[in-house]
Amino acid sequence: MRRLVIAATLLAALISAAPAAAITNGTADGNRHPNVGGLVSPTQYSDGTWIYCSGTLISPTVFLTAAHCGEEGERVAVTFDADYEAGDKVYYGTFHSDPLYGQDQSDPHDIAVVVFDKAVKGITPAKLPTAGSLSNLSGSQTFTSVGYGAYEVTNQPGGHQYLYNDVRMVATGTLNSINPSWLRISMNASTGNGGTCYGDSGGPNFLGTTNIVAAITITGDAVCRSTNVVYRLDTESARAFLSQYVTLP
């Protein structure tokens, strides 16, 4: 989910779901996933933070994220720092979203890339899944979710407050269900899971402990406690978009 921005098309498709943002019930990632980065706002938020969406380096010049994280042709900045502070190194590039984004409720095409002006050096890109490889996953399959989103949701008199700190976080969830475009991942703390929240949108959900990005974070429940809804990268439509920018497995 992008910073508390709810895409109307997603809301219609998923009813009560709201876009995802930050990792909850997780821990600081440190250097475990250096290929996961955050989109940095040109202006600071009122809480002193900067990052509004997450994503993954999938080639030296291509950064994978969600379409609802930007506008076609927009110039954006990306950090790969595990704990971002103003003035840290960023990489500049151009945002390109799937042109079919938002036109189909069953497959919203909520996928995008940032093409960097210069290749990112010293970071090994993540891998993508092969075609159709996620259709028959075991119910016990785990996913590693990574992102810069909200790390805690508090219930205040004025409503829920989402707390951010621009730190790359990681959590593990378990497969809940599979449909043609989505995976639903349990992030219920009572069963030992963690997951995503606002600000984690576009970030990766790695298959188990591998370097394969199975799906990207798109949405979930509004208080970031039960379900992480992620967009599959093994589908024909996702691969059709990605094939314009990277060589697919």
Name every feature range the model reports, one short phrase each.
Residues 42-45, 68-72, 82-85, 116-122, ...:
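Acidic glycine-/aspartate-rich tracts in secreted/extracellular proteins
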Residues 1-22:
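Secretory targeting and sorting signals
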Residues 108-193, 228, 235-243:
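Chymotrypsin/trypsin-fold serine protease catalytic domain
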Residues 31-38, 181-184:
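Short, hydrophobic/aromatic-rich segments at coil-to-beta transitions
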Residues 46, 76-85, 101, 139, ...:
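Conserved active-site regions of diverse hydrolases
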Residues 23, 29-35, 51-71, 77-78, ...:
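C-terminal subregion of chymotrypsin/trypsin-like serine protease catalytic domains
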Residues 23-32, 43, 71, 76-135, ...:
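Conserved catalytic-core segment of clan PA serine endopeptidases
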